[in-house]
């Protein structure tokens, strides 16, 4: 039986099985198997561009990557046209095999790369065609922008979410708070910091590990809300990505005010109309907010800081990250930094590599 058939068989069995106390462990086991087969299906994705690595630590010029996901004709091209410069000047992305047209959104001195993944995400989890590349690309995103058509049913959103869920992309979710380590010997040791309030029992954990042929491991569940699904995610950690998602409803000009109001109240959601030029600024601001980037202005000795060309780094970055962003080897030459701004105790503060910088700090770096 091919993997696709195996997946189908498990999905069918899951659909047939009634959900109750007596079956929850069996369902958990099936979910574990399903996760494994889905992974196999996507196994050669690593070599197909995008890579799925950490993507962006401190990217070259502070770029972040946003991927647009949506069904055809929801208005992705229109949105790209409105908020980006049409073509990327930077060609350091590896999606040449995709027909996506990356654009650059210039905002607050940052260059944010926006990649349109044409409506081919659909079917990716079934291993269809270029879907895998799309998935690999989506994995490297700092933010997923799900573009939805306000005039269409909620089905679009649910189906895209499910598609991403199936390939291991978790939207707006924290990593489960479970410590897990494979061991050489000693059997499986499971500890809960407080009794689980969900279906995640010691028995379930052991059963799933056995199915994965893992016979020695230490598991510490630190959150009583963790479920079997969370545990499966933890043991498949290399294939999971926790990505923020912003839901953007386009074409609000074509629905009633009540409907717009209802959509706009959903979490992580912005409403807009490309055609009427409504809400586009909100989309840009929300992208910026969700990316949670910091701007750092560099300053040479005796000269005013350069305020029009900040280095953009992830929020909570250190001077070390900043150095790495400037050049791979810069850290080795680093002597000290002078920092002005809200992260500094006094202005300027002399700091080392581990100092955490705030948004809009001014930094002078001194080399040996
Ligand atoms: N009523 C309305 N129509 C819109 C709006 N934005 C886009 N459209 C229309 O929706 C259609 C699709 O827009 P595109 O921007 O091409 O959509 P897309 O998602 O890029 O489509 P694909 O290229 O097929 O993936 C076009 O006919 C647009 O005129 C809007 O805000 N309101």
Swiss-Prot record:
Principal cellular location given in the protein's record: cytoplasm
Keywords: Cytoplasm, GTP-binding, Nucleotide-binding, Phosphoprotein
Pfam families assigned: MMR_HSR1, MMR_HSR1_Xtn, TGS
Record: residues binding GTP: 70-77, 116-120, 250-253
Protein name: Ribosome-interacting GTPase 2
UniProt cross-references to Gene3D superfamilies, sorted A to Z: 3.10.20.30, 6.10.140.1070, P-loop containing nucleotide triphosphate hydrolases
Location of the protein in the cell: Cytoplasm
Domain of life of the organism encoding this protein: Eukaryota
Alphabetical list of InterPro entries matching this protein: Beta-grasp_dom_sf, DRG, G_OBG, GTP-bd, GTP-binding_2, GTP1-OBG_CS, P-loop_NTPase, Small_GTP-bd
A Gene Ontology molecular function term of the record: GTP binding
Note: Present with 6200 molecules/cell in log phase SD medium.
Family: Belongs to the TRAFAC class OBG-HflX-like GTPase superfamily. OBG GTPase family.
Gene Ontology cellular component terms for the protein in this record: cytoplasm
Gene behind this protein: RBG2
Role this protein plays: Involved in ribosomal function.
GO BP terms: cytoplasmic translation; positive regulation of cellular response to amino acid starvation
Residue numbers carrying Phosphoserine: 364
Domain TGS residue range list: 292-367
Domain OBG-type G as annotated: residue spans: 64-292
